[in-house]
Amino acid sequence: MPNSRPRPRRGAGGGAGAAGRDRLVARSLQSAEHCLGDQDFGTAYAHYLLVLSLAPELKDDVKETFQYTLFKWAEELHALSRIQDLLGCYEQALELFPDDEVICNSMGEHLFRMGFRDEAAGYFHKAVKLNPDFNDAKENFYRVANWLVERWHFIMLNDTRRNMVYNAAIQKAVCLGSRTVLDIGTGTGILSMFAKKAGAQSVYACELSKTMYELACDVVAANKMENGIKLLHMKSLDIEIPKHIPERLSLVVTETVDAGVFGEGIVESLIHAWEHLLLQPKTKEENGNCGKYGKVIPAGAVIFGMAVECAEIRRHHRVGAKDIAGIHLPTNVKFQSPAYTSVDTEETVEPYTTEKMSGIPGGYLPLTECFQIMKVDFNNLQELKSLATKKPHSLNVPAIKEGVLDAIMVWFVLQLDDEYSLSTSPSEETCWEQAVYPVQALEDYCIQPGDRVTMEASCHDCYLRIQGISILHLEHEMEVMKGFTKSKDLLSLGNEAELCSALANLQTSRPEALEQTCMLEPTEIALLNNIPYHEGFKTAMRKVLSSLAPELLWQPMDTHCQYMEMNSGSGQSDAAPSTADPFYVLDVSEGFSLLPILAGTLGHVKPYSSVEKDQHCIALDLIAEANHFPKETLEFWLRHIEDEAAVLQRPKSDKLWSIIILDVIEPSGLIQQELMEKAAISRCLLQSGGKIFPQYVLMFGMLVESQTLVEESAVQGTEHTLGLNIAPFINQFQVPIRVCLDLSSLPCVPLSQPVELLRLDLMTPYLNTSNKEVKVRVCRSGRVTAVPFWFHLCLDDEVRLDTSGEASHWKQAAVVLDNPIQVQAGEELVLSVEHHKSNVSIAVKP
């Protein structure tokens, strides 16, 4: 805390008034310091406000102490949920210090924490403008920029063909008389500007995102169209005539379609537009000026599908192994990903995931021909209204190849009018991804030519839903459903004895054997399928536990058998009597983790899991029971602590941990926030000889040339946007690091061998350096556009987990250069690597 007391300066006017003011200022300063000493931050803050209102000339003297007081008081207000008071304090502070980047950044952090991302971005952006070298503000701005301006904006604006086709369709409509235009979900305003350039008389554009609305205002003004385009910061559903728009319009243009067509609400917005904003549609019999009628671009969409085999989708949506590093997964625990929805579900979550299938690691195998799922006419109000209420229709598609049914892949042709169209097929060079409906909950996923894939398609809750996916197999001249559940199979049993026998086999007569569905994120399912990860942890944990009790070294025998032996009878082995203290193992990795159960198989261990969700706890208990754990061996750590924010603490007041497992890399490929701080606390909680896993982390990187990364990170000039000046404005939201990459399938040319860039040591922090320069030899001539990076998690010196490996559940990341560097084979470049508060930056020096 700053501890300097400024001396009040006498006002130039002198006299009794000035003297009284000085005395009040001095007393208030003294009171503020006393309150700070007593940690009464609210009262101290009030005293500083009084001082600065009476003596603004003291701003520079008390600035640091005032900041400290403000931040401490704001944390207390946040803990008390006094949000209005908190925001009021920051507004007062910014009136006093309007150009203080530290206060701006702190205000942004509070707003972001409260969910006001648009507003937070404004404060982070202002802080960076005030001080471009302020790392905390830069990192905060990069983080929020990914939320506010999603990366697909850059990809779509760089898609020249998409821009040309939309421009041509809009030009044609305007030339045919559609002179009053509304652009729904305008984004940067590009479609509105196409309409204005085509000669539209009145153009309106609406955008809900505050950030994108303000960006569109800047873009439209820069292109000198601010007088011809009226921008509205609102949803199209809230637009009223004549309040916002004077009269009904002849044309609506929109691109509010996602990979599954309907996911961005296009059906709802077009129903509202036809009912409240557009002129009546032109009938087939009517001719004449199009300006008298209403019309929508795009005019409609045709949706296609294909059944595919794809190992990458499979490993993210189905748990393939029945045994993971010696842990048996019982059949009564069913894992599912959020993309799974049953036929009778009423959930409104997005029922699909999205992938760029042309670049998915390992590729995919078509199992059926392409088939049409549905067709929709955006210029037909009755058809739009019936979409959400129409009953699901069945599809029955013959298989043409042998394989494993992993997903239904969906794409569409967007028919802008009767002449112009865009396809999102994986065989097209397009900015769109495909919608993927993973197949789950079948008894058998194998398919042969002649089998048939059946499913139901609907537009329930304005999402395209593909449900009830099954395989019909032609066998003995009968179609037998392979996807029958066990309960349906029971109905075919011939007599009561068989029924009883089947029930016994299914263990449905025992209440504790009831099935538990466990919903996991795709990365969590991929983690369960990552066998080297679990085997690596098992090996490393065994080494540590053996070193802590050498007299308990295991005999060379099967681990599972030994574990069964040591836990039979009294539940303890001869080598580990019940009076001995167990080894305490804490797993604080995020999400669902089997590591505590793995630890429990290694001897006299008390493992603690930090899973939060009830269904995850139940699933782990069932797995522990199936693996013959003594009751209450596995504990759930969050049930034992009062403050969930303080997860890292002793197992008991007089005990320490033998192993603490930390989550060090996010699934996106970045270092976890506050990693080194967590490691510092963890080191204080370890017994002598105890370890943090991983013990250290190595970061690797390489030089590459990748036009894909360039175009996904920033808009490239005006050529792609057909002469419109958009790039400088949206590129303010570009971030230097691209996350969630698959280096194995990224279109790129390696220009160097991988090199070690950084070491983060969690056990011996004095080995760490925050800055490092690394020389990299160029092995191939080209343009360096990016530096992809990944990590090796070193559980010890022998056991390493590679986040770029084939089985990895982690993605990778890359630093994308602002300006590519031309290099020749044999040259050396220097990479300047900086690690600051769990954020890594890489600069390339020629």
Swiss-Prot record:
GO CC terms in record: cytoplasm
Pfam families: PrmA, PRMT_C
Superkingdom per UniProt: Eukaryota
Protein's recorded name: Protein arginine N-methyltransferase 9
Keyword field contains Nucleus: no
Principal location listed in the UniProt entry: cytoplasm
InterPro entries, per database record: Arg_MeTrfase, PRMT_dom, SAM-dependent_MTases_sf, TPR-like_helical_dom_sf, TPR_rpt
Subunit-level organization: Found in a complex with PRMT9, SF3B2 and SF3B4. Interacts with SF3B2.
Residues annotated as domain SAM-dependent MTase PRMT-type: 137-466, 530-846
Keyword annotations from UniProtKB, A to Z: Cytoplasm, Methyltransferase, Repeat, S-adenosyl-L-methionine, TPR repeat, Transferase
Catalytic activity, reaction form: L-arginyl-[protein] + 2 S-adenosyl-L-methionine = N(omega),N(omega)'-dimethyl-L-arginyl-[protein] + 2 S-adenosyl-L-homocysteine + 2 H(+)
MF annotations from Gene Ontology: protein-arginine N-methyltransferase activity; protein-arginine omega-N symmetric methyltransferase activity
Function description: Arginine methyltransferase that can both catalyze the formation of omega-N monomethylarginine (MMA) and symmetrical dimethylarginine (sDMA). Specifically mediates the symmetrical dimethylation of SF3B2. Involved in the regulation of alternative splicing of pre-mRNA.
Per-repeat ranges for TPR: 25-58, 67-100, 101-134
Record family assignment: Belongs to the class I-like SAM-binding methyltransferase superfamily. Protein arginine N-methyltransferase family.
Places the protein is found: Cytoplasm
EC number from the UniProt entry: 2.1.1.320
GO terms for biological process, alphabetical: methylation; mRNA processing
Cited CDD domains: AdoMet_MTases
